[in-house]
Amino acid sequence: MEAALEQHLEDTMKNPSIVGVLCTDSQGLSLGCCGSLSDKHAGVISILPQYAAKLTSDPTDVPVVCLESDNGIVMIQKHDHLTVAVHKVTS
């Protein structure tokens, strides 16, 4: 599984507008990262979708947390027990 995850991270980074990607487990431990997102971001990245899910009354909703700045956007979404963050620059 680790090799498959690393391959997915590398494939994601091939998009020229993506400058970082991070995958964490449900405990906030980094499972893999590339580019601008590093292991030190794993805890914060993993908790944000959990808080966002508390803002909806529909338990089947899967929120996407978007952190925007003048330089880009970080999109974060939880999938089962994994959380994925993608850092994309704006052109």
Swiss-Prot record:
Belongs to the LAMTOR5 family. It is found in: Cytoplasm; Lysosome. Transmembrane segments: none annotated. It comes from Xenopus tropicalis. It comes from the Eukaryota. Its main location: cytoplasm. As part of the Ragulator complex it is involved in amino acid sensing and activation of mTORC1, a signaling complex promoting cell growth in response to growth factors, energy levels, and amino acids. Activated by amino acids through a mechanism involving the lysosomal V-ATPase, the Ragulator plays a dual role for the small GTPases Rag (RagA/RRAGA, RagB/RRAGB, RagC/RRAGC and/or RagD/RRAGD): it (1) acts as a guanine nucleotide exchange factor (GEF), activating the small GTPases Rag and (2) mediates recruitment of Rag GTPases to the lysosome membrane. This is Ragulator complex protein LAMTOR5. The keyword Phosphoprotein does not apply. The lineage of its organism: Eukaryota, Metazoa, Chordata, Craniata, Vertebrata. InterPro entries: LAMTOR5. One of its GO terms (cellular component) is Ragulator complex. GO terms for biological process: cellular response to amino acid stimulus; negative regulation of apoptotic process; positive regulation of TOR signaling; positive regulation of TORC1 signaling; protein localization to lysosome; regulation of cell size. Part of the Ragulator complex composed of lamtor1, lamtor2, lamtor3, lamtor4 and lamtor5. The Ragulator complex interacts with slc38a9; the probable amino acid sensor. Component of the lysosomal folliculin complex (LFC). Keywords: Cytoplasm, Lysosome.
